Amino acid sequence: MIDLLVSILSNPSIIIALIAGLGLIALRKSTSDIIKGTLKTLFGFLILQQGAGIIVNSLIPFSTMFTEAFGLTGIVAEDNAIAAAVQVVLGKETAFILIFSFLINVLIARLTKYKYIFLTGHMMFSFAATMAIVLSQMGLSSIMTIVLGSIIQGISMVLFPAISQPSVRKVIGNDNVAFGFWGSSWISLSGWVGGLFGNKEQSSEDVKVPKSLDFLKDMSILMGIIMIIVYVVTAGFVDTDTMNEISGGINKYQFAIFEALGFVVGILILLMGVRMFLAEIVPAFKGIGEKIVPGAKPALDVPIFYSYAPVAVTIGFLAALIGGLIVTFMSSLLPVAVLPSVIGLFFMGGAAGVFGNARGGLRGAIIAGFFLGLTFSLLVALAYPLIGLSEYGISGLWFASPDAIIVVIIIKLIGLLFGVPL
């Protein structure tokens, strides 16, 4: 039974489809509308996931190319691999924290004015694993790890969407959805910084170009050209033998071009899924809200914001990559060298670009992305000594979610008050 609950709560597509179906039932829709709405929600979310998968698969070889091109060594921020690796040792604790934290989230939303329901399953799973690791390393028993971990995560599942909601409102223009992602506070902060120095009147989506370059107004064309340049230039710095290993013997420039185009295709698929998914889940979620948590807002994953400023996504990602690289080259001054986590910097940097654009236009998108890449990488480097992962057989990886890292720092500081060493 526990395994089934964990499986359901760890799979966001199942959660989303069930909630859509229940919401439509609560709204007393016809059987036809319930089936149609549930399946379209599921299809939209699966399309979104497929798009994200294509993006990740295009970024993996690029990340390898990038590391080889510039001879970088150090740690990479990556949550999911860590969460999976510790399940042999902390699987029970992770599972119970995941389940009870969701119940606490719903209870808080029901009893308080903070009506956010966190629905990003893989984020819930990685945070639960993080709590299990941190609290068990502080010497707590399994039961206390589960109790405290569930309470901390349940509160965080409401707190961080609440913190980011004013910024979400700036992006989407309403309160229909919230931000269910463990980087929401950092992305919101980055967007705010971008707004301080930007110009809201000059949106990244309205960049003026000469008539001869009018084709650049098409988001997919602009993104394709930019990513081809980035991939091809990076491939040019990789030696032929190494590049043959990465590409499987395909000409390195041909490989780079098609991986870049694959990235753009992933973005286009993701955006199509986002539009289909949001069109169904928002009205369905109102049905749930009316019956269980009046006024409930679904806190959803980061890609839902990309469709509001697609050009800003690319701008934010590239700016974040530059910011992350600066920290990498500062490694002699830091506890550890943090390699640019290309996948993490895309999802967070892209969102920072969108949030920065909403507050400060094109310049805001650039500044927000750069600020996120720089400060996120610094946060990882400076917090790295707080948690050791070698006892789980993990090396070269560390935590990648700024919100979770902030919570870990607070837990460690409170532990110090009770005599628990860092």
Provide a role label for each language-model segment.
Residues 1-51, 96, 100, 104-280, ...:
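Signature of multi-pass transmembrane helix bundles
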